[in-house]
Every structure is written in structure tokens, then in C-alpha cells.
């Protein structure tokens, strides 16, 4: 591929930015936006305002800082432009919308939403801001289309912190899965096309999230915690007989068999009788799944690169029954992924009953594109260098 010179690169950037600039209401915003984006794209150790200004607008740090932190960006006008551009690039029935979290580590306590909470970047509790992220992806190309700040419940109820960070009264605590549903609805209303919603167990464990996707007619493949209870697909439900002759009728129906945790449904290490798939990772990400040539049991129980097995189940997410237990819900695919590290991951999918194991594994592993997007946003575009501390600074 021929190298693109600086003049051609800037012309391409100008063409890409043109519809976004048209959505900005102020002349000074239209002037500073291209310089800010150039600062993010150009090489540099830090992507905060001062070092970027030194590279793209020497001597004009205050002007660039005003654009980033004081000048209000009309996101409601910019988001449809981003959605349209993303759909043109990667949208379609074979695209996926990935729901995930990413965290920005922070030192102080005054930035909006900062609290000691789980930080995936560090793999532990840390002082950070949490963002709900939704990249649209097809193949190996992810395009971030939504990034929403999560306000922890305790933080959202602290009037002092809210006031200092400029959080308006109408912005209240919403769980991450509800923020994700808000963004999914917005993207669909803007005409962004995708065929499946993907997410990890933090979203997959929420029955209300799965049910909302069902009601919206959206197929999904989501992670699942190992203690999630499920029933076999042929389970039946009936009202039990009274405990004694002439006794009161029972209030709740009872399933024909008890539910079990998903971790008990697959052999560990993998059973040679189970059909497995290997996942071959290329330099640009996961490739398509292939039928494993050697069963895991023949290699000491270690699957080659990652092995998959699936079975039909009914999740215990139906109406509530006695003892705070839940009755069987809809029939779904339960997928067990055996990783080379020895870890097992469980996934639930609404794919149709005739879906192949290759199709299920391909959907699950498409979440890799979200990890790639987060890595690029932080390492190449300086997402974790952003210095805004209030909700108005966006």
C-alpha cells in the first residue's frame, strides 16, 4: 500500500470531519475541532491538552483547553452523524453491537463519577471512572458509536459532588445495563444496522437486560456467571397437589426437575465425547472456528487454543416461584468455552435452535473487536489522558 503524505492525510481528514463540523453551531468550534482531532491522531507520548497544543497549535493552549472543557458540544447533533458514518463503514445484518465497560484510572476524587470500583484495566478495585462502551463491528473492524459515563449510585446521591461536577438534576443513577439499552434504542432509531448484540457476564447475568433485547427483537449472545441456574429444555411446570388431604391449594407452580448451575453441565476437563471447536487467533484477531482435529482429552484435557461445547437449556429467569426461585424461561443455547489457561467461560445465546456450534462460537468471539477498540482508544488516541472533570466537559 502506498504511503499517504501529510497533505493527502489532512485532506482525507478534512473530508471525514466535514459532516461533523457542519453539526457544530459555533465558528470557533469548527476551527478547533480539526486541530483537536489532529492532536489525537498524531504521534505523541501524551494526548492531554497541553502537549497536543504544543504539536498542533503552539502558544494556544488556553484556546484548545476552552474548546475541550468549556465549550459545550451538542452531542445530540453529532451522534447521528457518527452513527451514519459507522453504519456506512461496517453496518449491516452481519455486524455486531458489543456492549462492554472500560475504565479510566484517576488519582483525585473530584472528577465526575470517580469512585473506588472495579477497574478492568487493572483487574481490581481502583479509583476510576467507568464508561459503558458500544462499538459497532464487522469482521475485524470496530467503530465506537457510544461511550456513556456511569455514575455509581452512592456518587449520584451525593449532592455536594454533583454540584461541584455540574451534574444536572435530571441525570440520576442508572445501572450500566439500562445505559446500554438507552444507547441501543438511540442507535436503532438513527438507522444503525446490526444483527446481534454481544456482551460479557456483567450484562448477561441481568435477566431484565436479556428480556429487553428479546422484546426489541434483537438476537444476542452474552456471557453468563457460572452460578446461573438453568433447567433442561424438556422441563415441565405444574401445580403440585396439596400437602395433605383437604389442605390449601399450593400458590406456586413447580418445575418437574430442579434447576442446576451451568458450571455442572459440562465436564472439566473437557470430555472427549463432546464436540469441540478450536479458535485460531491471527495477527489481526480471531479467525473463524474450526472443528478440532484432536479431542481435548487426548491432550491432557487442554483444548487447542480454545474449545467449545453447547447444549439447549431453559434459564431460570421466568416468573418468580416459591422461595425466591424462578421458573423456567425461554429455551436458549448455553455455550461453554474452555480456554487454554484452564479457565471456563459460559455464554447464553438467543440464536435459533438450528444454529451450528461454529455460528455460536463465531458470535461469542466477535466480542474481541471491543477489546481492540478500547486498546486503540487508550494507546493510540489517549482516551485515558482526557482531563475533563465535570459532566459539562464532553
What function would you assign to each model-found segment?
Residues 1-2, 313:
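Short intrinsically disordered, low-complexity coil segments enriched in acidic
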Residues 99, 103, 203, 252-254, ...:
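Short amphipathic alpha-helical "interface-anchor" segments enriched in bulky aromatics
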